[in-house]
Amino acid sequence: MPADPLKFAYWVPNVSGGLVTSRIEQRTDWGYDYNRELAVLAENNGFDYALTQVRYMAGYGAEQQHESTSFSLALLLATRRLKVIAAVHPGLWHPGVLAKLGATADHLSHGRFAVNVVSGWFKDEFTALGEPWLEHDERYRRAEEFIRALRASWTEDRAELAGDFYRLRGFSLKPKPLGTAGRPHPEIFQGGNSTAARAMAGRVSDWYFSNGRDVDGVAEQIADVHDSASRAGRRPPKFGLNGFLIARDTEAEARETLREIVARADTEAVEGFGAAVRQAGRSTADGKGMWQDSTFEDLVQYNDGFRTGLIGTPERIAERIVAYKRLGVDLFLLGFLHYHEEVEYFGRRVLPLVRELEAADRTGPASVPAHA
């Protein structure tokens, strides 16, 4: 079990439509003013990180979207402690250019910039931008090379790389990003559920993000990533888990909210999203790409967030969160239906219970049920 207190991140709603593809009311907004207020509220309610989404075209319930790196910088400048993770596609960036942007953002925010490397997502976006859409495992091979080039740009005086996808020839980045003990450069996050994703995370990433999973699925993923890191001779990346959180005063209220979200799902958008993302992972060597076993209900929340089971009373959710920590989860990436009020509710009602359970685990044997 990680010794450090759990970290919490939230999905930034910088695209329209909220975090569920449903016609249920979502008291949220994709605009900057709303998100600036949300970022301040989040850092005052126990959140350590925010993750901006990367979308380039309308579709699947998201008709409007702000670009992730520029939006991340705006949120960094509006906050004092919150770390903001910008999602990027290797196929649409040169790592040296992103390294330059990241170094500047890191200085402007006093060391709070981070990046999430997204290997896949939507083929239609790459096609519309005139860029090649690689097969699944090739996308991860490119992403690994991207991360190596990014890290070299941030840490070496004259970075050199002669890769299959990128080249650096004596690239000298000045100023370097701000380095501190335990953080020599901006943190590098990476997502993915496939075998290729897990192997890559063990070799090069600082953090590994998983889609929503049950306890058994998370334990399997953590073991795979740690095994990959061991073979690479490096410390394993920290583990982040996605979850859509529905905390209510009673279990019945929480379950009814979930039932209504799914009952009012935008069927056409959910099925279109499912077809698009399954195509992205279908070409894996072992057929274990992201979303390959996701049900319709899972897909209503883009990243299988219902599967993590953070639905119920504050007490039940806190127990569930700490049960995952005992498996090795270091961070939860959370989404909400009504962001402002639910982030505040989380900070006031759920987080104190999590900290109490963590303290109890440090002083005695674990006895909290997982409610799997």
Can you name each region flagged by the protein language model?
Residues 1-78, 176, 180-186, 368:
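N-terminal beta1-alpha1-beta2 module of alpha/beta enzyme domains
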Residues 1-14, 40, 129, 136-182, ...:
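An alpha-helical appendage that flanks or caps ligand/catalytic pockets
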Residues 2-3, 40-44, 73-81, 102, ...:
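Acidic (Asp/Glu)-rich catalytic clusters
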Residues 6-10, 50-52, 83-88, 113-117, ...:
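Hydrophobic faces of well-ordered beta-strands that scaffold small-molecule active sites
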Residues 8, 42, 46, 75, ...:
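Conserved, mostly hydrophobic/aromatic
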Residues 29-42, 98-101, 191-200, 258, ...:
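Short, acidic/polar
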Residues 62-85, 142-146, 346-362:
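Alpha-helix-loop-beta-strand connector modules within alpha/beta enzyme cores
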